[in-house]
Structure formats: structure tokens, C-alpha cells
Amino acid sequence: MKKRFLIKVSCILAAAIIAIGAVMPAMASQFKGAVKDAKTSETVIGAIVVIAGSHFNTTTDFDGNFKFTDLPKGHYSAFVTYTGYKRTDTFSFEMASDTIVIEHDFRMESTEHELKVVVVSGKLNAESDQFARKTEENAANLVNIMSARAIQISPDITVANVMQRISGVSLERSSNGDGRYAIVRGMDKRYTYTMIDGVKVPSPDNKNRFVPLDIFPADIMERIEVNKTVTPSMEGDAIGGSLNMVLKNAPDQLSLNVNLGSGFSEYFFNNPFISSNKSMIQQQSPLEKNGPNYLATGNDFTRANLDFKNTAALPYGIIGVSISNRFFNKKLGILVASSYQNTNRGSNNIYFPTITSINNTPAFKDIINRNQSSNLIRSAVHAKVDYKFNNKHQVSLYGIYTNLQDFESRISYDTSLTATRTGPGTGKVTTLSRSRAETQYIGNITLQGKDALLPDMYMDWSSSFAIAGTKVPDWAELNTFTSDTLHNGVPGASTATLQPYNRIWEHNTDHTISEYLNLHYTPTILGKEVEFSVGGMFRHQDRDNYYNSYTLEPVLMGTPPAFPVYTNIYNAEWSVLDPTGNILGGPNYKAEEEILAYYAQVRLELNKLQIIGGIRTENTWQGYTSNLTEAVAANSGSITYRDFLPGIHLKYRLRPKQNLRFSVYEAIARPNYFDLVPVGTPATENFGTQGNPYVKHTTSTNYDVRYEWYPKPNEQIIVGAFYKDLINPIENTVVFTKAGDAVIQPNNFGNAQNMGFELVGIKYFRNFGVSANYTFTYSVANVSVIKNNYNPVTGGLDSPNVLTVNTTRPLQGQSKHIGNLSLFYKNAKYGLDVQLAYVYTGRRIIQVSQFEGLDYWQRATSQLDFSIEKRIGRRFAVYVKVQNILNTPVIVEIDSRYPYPAGEFPFQKAGGNSYLVEKDTYGQAFLFGVRYRL
């Protein structure tokens, strides 16, 4: 009922707003026309048409048209202004009657003076949709772009959630429901890398190299680029593609932007916000504070951070500020931007841990019901200084620091479905009360420059230092246990008893130095401009991962000695089983990586055909050391490999604004840092992890073809297809250790093919617009799996007990169908922007099993979001954003016939063709705020 009500409210609101703008009374007198680029004749969208000496002004719509209605009789003068263009000449006219209609088209001249190296002054607004479409059209490779303006009026406030609006991109979400990682064209997140202003940034993750995108607030971005193909001049570990976040630059005039917002999560209407005293979390372990010989006692561990209380969730707090200007005749640009987002998210999780039974079907061990409350504090600071010495030389220095703090409180009820269970409503229950504070951060400083060496030769260079890391201090999950009892034949529960539990400290740092140098020579040969490019890149990266765990056991009480009854956290007493901690176990390791890459590339223009071709060589060295003893195989090690990555990219201009593209290129994917380290990590969620020192890097040959049409500056039609042939794809699979524990381990799975097609369309009808994209992806991974050699007659196993089976399946993370549909309404005169956005993500494998047919599949999801922005005067705007209107659950299942009767296990569907493994619900999120723009 509540879901249907929210849908109705959103639809009625959108319809009402559209009706206000669409049903306007017809006025008799009119002054109307269009604004166009004087050189290209393209319409200029968002240009300001001003009636001089009056309060009358308007902006052009999606078709570049403008209209003034019901102007009083009299003489008028009108002109047009827009960023990147000269002010037009004044047009004078007379409204001689109440019925007169005057039409006039304005032609605007660009202020852009572009040389081969440096754009001196003036440019199309880089934050506009028009700039995004023009960049896509002129790009050397296949790219999709989301502009700052599109981001601003979308329902999203993080880069991760923005990504789901881009063609071919789906999201992997965190436990609080926010988008976290991008999956491009069905390729797992490990096959994509992330850049800031063209420079790759390290990941704060303690095991992986892919970057969590929810750490970046969206309001500091100028645009977001998703490269579907890479040229030889670009880094080659991009089988799926690459993401480039272009940060805001200083415009040509003083600019001040302020954003103040708030909001709330609907989840907390019906659920309390679970919290504890996070200030009592100790940042260092007893060993770190007191030295390696210190013996910890129970008094070294705080308790208030495990004293959970049910409270009311506070409203969101959102602040964004940016200020910029240019000085010294526009040569010096300075920009400073900051963003702060304090939000509360909640979730409910149902989870069934499963094992594989003797007859190769899933079997339940437990059912776990989790209620989680998260306080997320996301902050970022970005500063950029650029200086243009002259037409031949320019330099820029920028820095960014972004930080995401996640204070998580979670209560889990783990009911055993095996031991002592006699039927529904019975079973042992373990209550797990978690306190976890995680801080992730990324910092980057980059110095870049462009220099003309000769009239036909220039170079560009970058020097970057980056740091990233994660801190998880005093991770704790209090454990109490309730056993079965019977009271007059009725199932009941005993008093909760305290159980052993762990206190964990974990942190990691990543330091990266990157150097880039590119040299370009552009002679004219036989009347054709040719560009020869050579360049290189060197990167040194080192990572240090620290892990220490203490096991606290309750002090035994009574006769015979037994675990005590739990009353509250302050009365509990513990002894420390490992007073120096478990520093030798867990993921303690150091990793290093060095990459030396160089390339040669040529770009040739032959009338309508552009050819870009070349070859890139990447030399990789990866090494690691662990805390494992020398008796353990591969306790330290290194690997070296060299890849030759040729590529050719063709772009044929069928006619103005229409391109036909073809690309073929080689790419790679390196193992994650922890992938090679043979140590294990204890399970903190559903599985532990285990490295694999024998995993190989992945190589791929990639083919792309795409047709593009840009009928208007902010419109496009794209039809494309792709094919990827992968050798040694890396996927995470559930395996069993010698001790019988289920862990996730990276492995190579033979060869795989990934193919599909993309459709993209953006069209505007005066004040209305529609944006739609659809991606079909089909992949085949040829894999070897196992199954028990079960004999249904004897009910046992025949010899050999385990069989190897060759089979096929889709790649992990790949959805066959991905779709986006957004409906827009824009009324420039009344300052209205309305958007209703729908995202569909098809079912996909999220966890691979080593047993045949027992992979974990995530069901298809549909998400509906809404946003509206209303301008108030020339400086202010108010907005509302609603996320997850449908309250879509995320459901994980195993495709196997469910054999149990109704009511045997909760949440399962009798007679169904799947086992429910996990279900998450998050509720809706509502945001509202005000913007000021100078």
C-alpha cells in the first residue's frame, strides 16, 4: 500500500508540474525566434535573451528557441549572452499592437581561439550537455559522458549512483544500499580502472585495485567520462573500460556556488536507528599503543562502543561550496570546491548460509536476520590552479582529498536450522551485535603541463603523487547465545549466555607515484595533417596492510564452570586468549608494483576518414611479502610479465554530425594485490577470503563498431556492438580449505567471450525530453566445476567421490539486460527541471561456486527515482530528490528446485525452482535543498 501511494504521489507531482508549464494561456503579442552558432548554425541551448532596460529576459529551450509573450506596446532592444560566445548585436523592434508577432534569429560568434596546443580563452560551457555531446562526437575513442548539469538535476549525489544512468553500466551496491562499484558492459569491476583528470588513482581497499565510487561526491565533478575503448596512448588495463572523473575548472569570470540540503530515509519511519558511542572506539590496538611485548587484558578494551541503543535517526546534512575566478587577463585560474554529506542509511537483511549436500543440492545451516544502521559522512576538498603563460605554454596544479566514514551498528539474529532443531520456531539462536567504523580516503596531487616546442610539435606531461587507504579500528561483534528449551511441550529459549568474540584492528595505506610524458608531431604530408605521438608512463606503487585480532573469552562462572549469563556490556568480564594479538595471522602483507609503459601512435585524416593506430607495451612487476613462515609455500613472491597491446580505431564521417566507428585493440587485467597473497582473512560477512599466488593476469582482444548521430547539440542516437575474447579471466569462487572452511578465492577460469550491443537515444520536444539506453550482453565462460558422484539408489557416493564437469556459464557480474529510461521536463522561463528516472538491471551471477549449478544469482532489479528543481530569481534554486521510490529489494538465490514443504523454512517458496539465499531492503531516501549561484 505504501509503495503504491509513493508511486501515485510522484506521478501526480510530475504531471502537475508539467501541466503548469504546458497549459499556458495563449498571448496575443509575441517576440520569438532562435539562437544559433554563427559558424556551425547549431542551436544554442540555455542562452540568455535580454530585453534591454527592462526586467524581461528568458533562456532558449532544448531546440534553441525563445519566446516573449504579451509585451506592452512600445520600442524595445534585445540582445543575447552566453558563456563562450560574444554578446550579440542589439536587435531593435516595436510592439505596435496587441496582436503583432515579431520573429528574429540571433547569430552568436564564439570567443574560442584554439591553437594546436593551448585553448587561450573562451569555450563552450564544459559543464553543459552540449559540451558532453560535442566531446563524444569528436573523441578519438568510444566514450559516453555525463555532464555536471545532468548530474545536478539527477536524483543522485554520489558518483557511484550517477554511473547507473550511463549506457552499459550497472552497479554493485554496498550493504547500506548505495551504489559502490561500476560494472561496464557486464565486465566485473576488476576489469575497469578509475582516473581523475586523466591520471589513474589508487584504491583505498585493503585487497583490491578497483576504486569504490561512493567515496566521491558528485557535486565537485565537471563531467564523468566512461571510455568504452582505449587507444595506444591510454593505459591498457581496460578490458571493460575506464572511468575518468574530470574535476571542476575555473571559468572565465567570478563564480560562487553554494548548496545546502537535508533529507531523511524512509527506512527509519518503521525502524529505530541503532547506535553506540563511536567516540569510544580506540584507533590503535593494545599492541600498537604499548609495543610488541605488551600483554593485553580485558580492561584494555572499551565497552561503550558495544552499548547499543535505539534512537531516532537525525536528518541529513548536505553542504557544498565552490568559488573560482580568473586573474591577470584571464591567465591565472583558481578554483576551490568542497563538499560535505552526512546521511543515515538503514537496511534489513535475511541470509541463509548454505552448504552442498551429498546429492548436489543446497542445504541450509542457519537463517540470519540482520538490522543495520549506518551513519555515512562523505567529505571532499578540491583545489585547482592553472596558469596560461602564452599561446604555447600552460601549467596546472590540482589536489583532491576525499573521505568516507561509515559508522555501522548491526544486530543479527542467527538461528540454527540443524542442531537441536525440531521444527518451525525452534533452534539455537546466536545474537551478534556489531560495531564497525570504517574510514576510506583518497588524496591526489597532480602537476600537469602543455608546451609547444616547435610550430608543429608539442608535448604534454603529468607528475602525480597519490595516497589511499582504509582504517577499521576496533571492529567488534558481541556474541551471545540462547539455546532451546521446552516449557510444557512449547518451544522456548534459555537465558542468553556470553560467548567468545574478537576485537579487530585493520588498516592499510597505498602510496603511488605516476609520471606521464607524451610528445606529438603534426606535420602536413601531401596536404593532409598527420599526428605522430610517442610517450611513456612509469608508476611505482607500494601497499602496506596491517591486521591484528584479539580473542576475548568470558570469564567462566559457577560450578561446573560455564559461560556466564549476559546482563549488560558493563557487567561482562573477559580474559584475552591471545594477549599479544594475532599479528601473524590474517591479511598482513606488503605489496609493490611497478609499471613501465611506452607507446607509438599515429593519427591520419583522409577526407572523411580518421585513422588512429599504434602499439603499446606494458611491463609489469608485482611482488609481495607476508607474515607467513618460510615453511608455507609462496609466503613471498613476485611475478613479471610484458604485454604488447596493438590497437586501431577508425572513424568515418558519413555526413555532418554522423560517425561510423570501428575499433580493435588488445587489453589486460592485472590480479588484485591480495589475489597473489596466500593468506586467509576470517569471515566478517558471509565468507572469508584466501589469496592464490598462482593466478594469472587476463588478456583480451576487443572489437567494437558504433554508429553515432547528433541531430542537435544535446541530442544523440547511438547503435553499437562489441565482442571481447578473454584468456584467463579472473573470478572469485567459493572453495573449501583443508580445514573445511568455505572461503572466496580468485581463480582463472579457462577462456571466455563477452559480446553484446548498445542502443542510446536522447531526444527533446521543446520543453519535454526523453533519454533512453539499452545494453544487451551475452557472455560464455568455459569452466571446470565439480560435483559429488552421488548414487540415488544407495544414497551414498560412488568412486571416485568427486567428478569434474566441463560446463559454461555467464561471466560473474554480467547482466544480460540493462536499461535506462528518463523523462524530462524543462521550462527555462519558469526555471523548472523535472526528471523521472528508471533503471533496470537484469539478473546476474554475484558469487561463483565450485559445484556445478550452485552459483549465487542476483535477481533482476528495477529502481525508480525522481528529482525536481525550481529556479527562484536569477541566483537561487530549490530542489527535491527521491531515490528508490519502489523500495526495490535485492534478492540472491540459487537456481535449484526447492524440495521442502511450505513452512519448513521461513521466506522460502515451496515448489519453487530456486532457494532464497539473501534478501536486502533499504527504503526510500528523500532529499531537499537550496542552491545559490553567483
Q: What do the predicted segments below correspond to?
A:
Residues A160-K200, R223, G241-S242:
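Extracytoplasmic beta-strand/coil segments of soluble accessory domains associated
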Residues Y840-Q847, K870-L934:
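C-terminal beta-signal and adjacent terminal beta-strands/loops
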Residues Q30, A304-R410, G443, P646-I648:
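Transmembrane beta-barrel wall of Gram-negative outer-membrane proteins
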Residues P424-Q448, I583-L596, I668-L726, T737-Y764, ...:
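Outer-membrane beta-barrel signature, preferentially recognizing the C-terminal barrel domain
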Residues Y723-D725, V743-R844:
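Gram-negative outer-membrane beta-barrel transporters
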Residues L171, V199-K228, K248, F273-I274:
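Short acidic/polar hinge/loop motifs at secondary-structure boundaries
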Residues K36, I48-V50, T81-T83, V101-Q152, ...:
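Short, acidic, small-residue-rich periplasmic hinge/interaction motif at the N-terminus
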Residues I215-N259:
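A beta-strand signature from Gram-negative outer-membrane beta-barrel systems
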